[in-house]
Amino acid sequence: MPLAMHIVLWTLGAVAVLLFLVYLIGGYFMYRVAIRRDDKRQNKCWELPMSKRDSESDEDFARMKEGEAFVKGRLAEFVTITARDGLKLTARVFEHPEARGMFVMVHGYRSSSLGDFSGAVKPVYDMGYSLFLIDQRGHGRSEGKNVCFGAFERYDVVDWANYIKQRWPGLPVVMDGVSMGSGTVMLGCGVGYPDNVKAIIADCGYTTPGAICRSVLHKHMHLPTFPIYYGGRLWKKLLAKYDIDKISATDALKKLSDKSLYPHPIPILIAHGHKDGFVPYAMSEENIKSLEDKDGNLLPFAEFFTSEEADHGMSFMKDYDGYMAAIGRLFDKAGLPHDKVEEPAFVPETPVSELTRDDADTGMIYTIN
């Protein structure tokens, strides 16, 4: 064999070995960074005072701090369930004295329910709804070594809805998810919610876990999807026991029109900010197509809301009035009340001035964590 051919074959072999190593090592890196539980990188809003991000205006942050003080000034009931794979999952419940329903707030990736819903907790409570703030598996007080992008979490939210049905019979439930939480509540549609779930809100969710992982690899980590993404997919299959490309929120939403699963479709609101720099706005445009008829019109039980100025998860803050109006239309379809409930002013056990201090000693002032 000519020397040149030997060189070509050796070069091709070396490239193949290199690609295989990148496939395995880069994929494992992706698994460790994206999937494995990492409490150091997670949102610490329950333990520490909230801090302002560059994308938040002073007005937005003031509303978020008000929500933080509103929740942290109350004592929570901690409730737990056992997931279908044996993990213990935890939620905090803040019951309204004259509850019209229960808002299940499902947070996003490496976040917390308080971090993602601080701007919404008080308006929701003021409508007469109890707050049910869950810790997704792999986050907070819930067990779990992996974050699964809805693969297992979709069953968790259905099980939480069943828990509420048993604990509070007849109480309507609203499933409300942001980012990965949005993907979770949409994927739950494909599992089958119990009949106490009367409405769903899905804010800035993705189409599939695989699609958002590829997008983040390319746009934010500046890494090639091949071979790293596919190596990561292999490690997820081996170690986390799910296939990131076999799960689709777009497909799950189609189940809302399945009469065998939902004799009466659950009204749903899809929301997304145009300036979302993390989950592409186009993903919600694709998801909403699952809720259109053959002529491209939204099905009667669906709502779509967008804010021109909102970044990731900020539509509620950037267009509060428009978002609340969309919730009102959603609730009208669901037969749920949404007018404000008057009640005596609540005085937190801990003064609000203390709860919102930047140098707050969390061990001394917080009533819950």
Walk through the language-model features, giving the residues of each.
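Conserved alpha/beta-hydrolase
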Residues: P123-E143
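Short alpha-helix in the alpha/beta-hydrolase fold that links the catalytic acid
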Residues: P280-D293
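The serine-hydrolase catalytic nucleophile loop
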Residues: Y109-P123, Q136, A282
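Hydrolase active-site cap/lid region
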Residues: L187-D245
